């Protein structure tokens, strides 16, 4: 378990702690105490707050959930937070978050124990056809605890565990890359900017793992993955700056899709820009897409940003992006994600 209260002391379902209840009305607090005692709990009141020690988080949430339903009929609104007794900092979680956490015990266990691995998808240099890097993609490490990465991150976000999962996935990717890749091979690793509230603090553990595993920082490329609008560009610029101060490269993913615009590319000035598949798919048959790609490449060239075409699934797409002047490419036509890295070069023979 991590020791940072923001990135997540993660209470397990068996962890002991105290639930803190509040109600606006004095009569409401009396009613809460009565209901808790009727359920076998031993509440203690301190001002407007009612403290109830529990043997486990799971027990607490199930009792509070039932209590909430009972009191709703009396018109009393209950607010509850959990404080886990094992935390050095004390970790406060509201009832809604706790309900999410116990809704999928297997997901909580996966995050708590890091029960996942990574597959690698090759990225080629279009000028030399050599494999210059691998993107790391989270996958289950066993059939016992299976998950879809998107669903796991969605659960983590609702359960207030997104920072924990993002940090674990980032560090695990670095460790995995140290075992499988030679020095000089770029390692493209996703990160969620919303999970990093203070770059200098939150990224210490990442840089520690880099050093421990002897990974050259210049071989790392951390790429922004964000499904929601970036409201604080200055914060993201600060994250990029922190990475680059340590010699790490940065990339902006999904260009041309959603909020990852060319204007954002020019504001952030990453080392790499990854163009979304929506612009690459059948670009050989779409002159409008080709024109958009040309303009994107021109503006990237001004800032010396290397451009990567994602989602290449056909030979014709590969040929077009190469002719247009893309530096790099990635996709199923080149190579699918795998446990082990693809060979050092790419050939179209037999494709």
Cite the ranges covered by each PLM segment:
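EAL-family c-di-GMP phosphodiesterase catalytic domain
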Residues: 1-90, 94-99, 130, 226-229, ...
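Active-site core of bacterial EAL-family cyclic-dinucleotide phosphodiesterase domains
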Residues: 95-154, 337-338
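Structural preference for beta-strand elements that scaffold enzyme active sites
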Residues: 117, 135, 186-188, 219-223, ...
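Glycine-rich beta-to-alpha transition loops that act as phosphate-gripper elements at the mouths
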Residues: 123, 253-259, 306-315
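Conserved, mostly hydrophobic/aromatic
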Residues: 129, 169, 173, 189, ...
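Catalytic-site-adjacent helices and loops of nucleotide signaling machinery
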Residues: 149, 158, 252-265, 318
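Catalytic core of bacterial c-di-GMP phosphodiesterases, primarily the EAL and HD-GYP domains
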Residues: 163-235
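Surface-exposed amphipathic alpha-helices with a cationic face
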Residues: 210-211, 237-249, 294-301, 322
């Amino acid at each position: 378990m991590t020791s940072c209260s923001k990135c997540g002391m993660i209470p397990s379902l068996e962890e002991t702690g105290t639930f803190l209840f509040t109600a606006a009305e004095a009569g409401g607090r009396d009613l809460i105490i009565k209901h808790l005692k009727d359920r076998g709990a031993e509440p203690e009141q301190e001002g407007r707050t009612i403290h109830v020690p529990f043997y486990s988080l799971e027990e607490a949430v199930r009792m509070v959930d039932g209590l909430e339903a009972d009191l709703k009929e009396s018109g009393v609104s209950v607010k509850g937070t959990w404080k886990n007794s094992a935390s050095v900092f004390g970790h406060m979680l509201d009832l809604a978050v706790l309900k999410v956490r116990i809704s999928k015990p297997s997901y909580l266990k996966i995050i708590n124990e890091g029960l996942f691995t990574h597959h690698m998808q090759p990225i080629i240099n279009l000028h030399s056809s050599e494999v210059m890097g691998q993107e790391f993609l989270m996958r289950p490490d066993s059939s016992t605890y299976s998950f879809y990465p998107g669903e796991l991150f969605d659960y983590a976000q609702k359960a207030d565990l997104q920072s924990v999962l993002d940090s674990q996935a980032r560090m695990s990717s670095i460790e995995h890359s140290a075992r499988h890749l030679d020095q000089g091979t770029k390692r493209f690793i996703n990160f969620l900017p919303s999970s990093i509230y203070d770059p200098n603090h939150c990224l210490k553990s990442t840089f520690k793992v880099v050093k421990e595993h002897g990974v050259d920082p210049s071989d790392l490329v951390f790429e922004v993955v964000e499904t929601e609008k970036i409201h604080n560009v200055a914060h993201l610029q600060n994250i990029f700056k922190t990475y680059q101060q340590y010699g790490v490269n940065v990339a902006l993913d999904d260009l041309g899709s959603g909020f990852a615009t060319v204007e954002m590319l020019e504001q952030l000035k990453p080392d790499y820009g990854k163009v979304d598949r929506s612009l690459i798919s059948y670009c050989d048959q779409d002159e409008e897409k080709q024109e958009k790609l040309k303009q994107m490449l021109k503006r990237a060239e001004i800032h010396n940003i290397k451009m990567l075409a994602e989602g290449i699934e056909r030979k014709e797409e590969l040929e077009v992006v190469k002719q247009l002047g893309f530096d790099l490419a990635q996709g199923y036509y080149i190579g699918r994600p795998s446990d082990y890295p693809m060979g050092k070069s790419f050939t179209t023979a037999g494709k």
